[in-house]
């Protein structure tokens, strides 16, 4: 596939965060860009204002004529789209050039040095942090991110001169096997997506295979203590990292007054007094990995210090919506038990003497079925849990799998309830809340503006 000869690109599942970065990339190249998504969102509306043509009905008559020329049209779809989708079927039956999002990402980044961040969790913040460090340094970078950077208001950064491309490497559907990393961080390998992989062993094997794709001359930066065994090619250097130990780690950690400072330690340097722009404890570990990537790519110590201090975070990743003396409200994308535990622990560290209320919308029936006890354990670290119905995404319901499974396994004595997401606002209006955390990867975050308004009126500080 020659990207240069393509005139039109059609996206099925245009509203996905990873898809939208590709949409912005092809718009920047002057291509005609159109597509379908199931529902309108703030992101799809933004893409329309940027030049994309997007519709929300599954209807081949709504596909623009420019996208019906199979010789000059590339069709991109996400694995979340059902195989029987009418538009996908039309393109298949008519012999169009059809690729998964991950395949296209692999093709367009193959000519650059890919700086990839893989792992069950932490990859969006770590990759966005690394992209910011490089973008504001003399090194520069292009970046395809899995979240909206608060520094830039987008999930795509472009550089005409830098050899580096920062990529969030997604293990879902083995998507990251299409990449050719120059360097890669692996943050975590807690089993997930067992609907795809079946077993923990298959999940870990997928990460092992991914490490074989790192190019000779490059590097693997592996979180210390992971179960997986890397299998890198000759000429690839393997480093370890974590918060407190490894080739890259933090020392002299200072947390207080809403600020975090660390010293970064590497085999060949030490950078003292780095301030975290988003001062939550999980970002110490994320920061160590991001700094390691930037350091190995040539960013100077001073550029790294300035970049870490000016990093503003990622939408829906420990995203403070409201903060005053009477109420704190934040949203976090955490949707795996290990992520939720880290998120709640980080909140607890910041607000030790306050009641922490978590609203959690489980994401996927299969994930809920596979991990409901682990979800209950992680959520039980809070003081109160409000569960909504499961967000299905690409899945059909599974008999007997509901939020009740998590509810029934929460620790004894915890305040808890289940409600429809439509009733969350009225429930919060009646409750006394001190610190509210909305967790999950579904659509509950769409209510964040209304929740913010309700709480700011109720607890005007």
Model-inferred region functions:
Residues 50, 376-434:
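C-terminal helical cap/extension that packs against the catalytic core
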